Amino acid sequence: MIETPAAAVISDKLAPKVDFFSVGTNDLIQYTLACDRQNSQVERFCDNHHEAVLRLIEYAAGNAHSHGKWIGICGELAADTTLTERFLRMEIDEFSVSPSFILRLREKVRSLNLSE
């Protein structure tokens, strides 16, 4: 699991030792941005679209693929269809979402033209 910034940063070293990566986006956001969605004093710092988080995911994806491994994402970001195209361009291989989000995610994927 890539759930901490440290794991993402050393994903080039982890990739040869694992079968795949799964990015736990809820924890990755909290640990990267020093925020807590369940603490009203710091929840405002949680930004699901923060560039630092997205770059860590992209970096881990590149390292996974350079070692012939697949990478999936889970957590709230996996179901966020405003990020689906970006994740597909990162070559994220799998989206792990709750059943209630499957149809919406499938429709989003089908609507995209990634060859543009």
Give a label for each model feature.
Residues M1-E116:
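Conserved alpha/beta-domain cores
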